[in-house]
Curated annotation (Swiss-Prot):
Record carries keyword Chaperone: yes
Matches recorded under Pfam families: FKBP_C, Trigger_C, Trigger_N
Main location (coarse class): cytoplasm
HAMAP family xref list: Trigger_factor_Tig (MF_00303)
Domain PPIase FKBP-type, chain residue ranges per copy: 170-255
Database matches in PANTHER family: TRIGGER FACTOR CHAPERONE AND PEPTIDYL-PROLYL CIS/TRANS ISOMERASE (PTHR30560), TRIGGER FACTOR-LIKE PROTEIN TIG, CHLOROPLASTIC (PTHR30560:SF3)
NCBIfam families for the chain: tig
UniProt name for this protein: Trigger factor
Gene that this polypeptide is encoded by: tig
Amino acid sequence: MQVTETQADGLKRAFRVVVSAADLGAKADAKLAELKGQVKLNGFRPGKVPVAHLKRVYGKSVMSEVIEQTVNETNGKIVEEHGFKLALQPKVKLPEEDPQAQGLLEGGKDLAYDLEIEILPKIELGNFKDISVEKLVVEVSDAEVDETIQRIADANRPFVTREGGYAENGDRVTIDFTGYVDGEKFPGGEGQDIDVLLGSNGFIPGFEEQLLGVYAGDNRTLNVTFPEAYAAKELAGKAATFEVTVKSVAAPGPLTLDDEFAKTLGQESLEKLKEMVRARIASEHAGAARQKVKRALLDALDTTHQFAVPEGLVEQEFFGVWSRVQEDLAAQNRSFADEGTTEEEARADYRKIAERRVRLGLVLAEIGERNNIQVSEDEVTRAVVERARQFPGQEQQVWEYYRRTPEALASVRAPLFEEKVVDFLLELANVTEKTVTREELYKEEEDDEKAA
């Protein structure tokens, strides 16, 4: 076997590999000898089939198997001998021209192929004790707890029928409706016994406003225009009319925030309800603060660990990111111009994001490997169970899906590993707490999540 390195450019390597026909033939003969005692052919006793006859019958298929095995073994040796860590699966270019390929399968030609690989960079880790980050802290105020409980109360408030009354803002109007665009009904444009909470802005602009003043038994024609960014593209920006029949009008009834109200929500008292709400708000704030400090930590790692990353990994990450961007724009019926940019500029920006993600992923993986940070099978199982609970009635199907799909299981393990490495780094870094308001905590949160 001859191996010649033909490229050593950055993280890319290429090799020309030649395996003699004699070596391939010897391997093929050995496999045919194994087959001799296994195959049954008419006219021959078991185990007595001549190897020459086996070669005529099975020669090409055996040689094909030998070539595949030889390529895999040779590639493995090259990677091992050079101490490479592969970024992606190797690319193998085998002979494609028919005479050459036939000659290989018939055992009369040397195997000559090209191997292209992309390797992971060697990463020099910085001193994590030099990293300084702020951890934002928000104290949950009584006012925030009271506001949250009031929202819960409003969502659970009873409604009382307005006998002969006219609908006001805040009332619940129950309607049947049929919608028309250009005089024709459209999919999803009909509904029966639909509750509309006036003033909630739960329907397209102008719909709720035109229901003010209606009464039970009333019939109205509503004229509206679908938003330009409406999810259903065929309706976006179009004028529509809705023929509406009012079934009932109900006003919000009285509701007292007391122990009895708390019991309707599964709490033994109003005080216990407040404790539960405070804990939930505190948990939400802690999650947001975690994202902020994680973003700051990743920014610091990105600044202190600049190195070339495998183009193939960047392309994979960019493809995933870009696909989601296009899907989101399509779902909202928006364009890059609507976002104040061009497709070219957006591509450049998201490619930078993809490169950052790949680089940080490699850094975190290196930190985890050097410090023996691992995710246990129990932790993965608990995470899968948690995901399965999000699909009531389908838990078993979800569990089986993850059990049968290694890629899906890896998607569960990866974030668990990342959070463990982040915890490890935060133990080493200089973390100072800073008390801020709720508004300051959630400022630019979406940008933080996208960049992280």
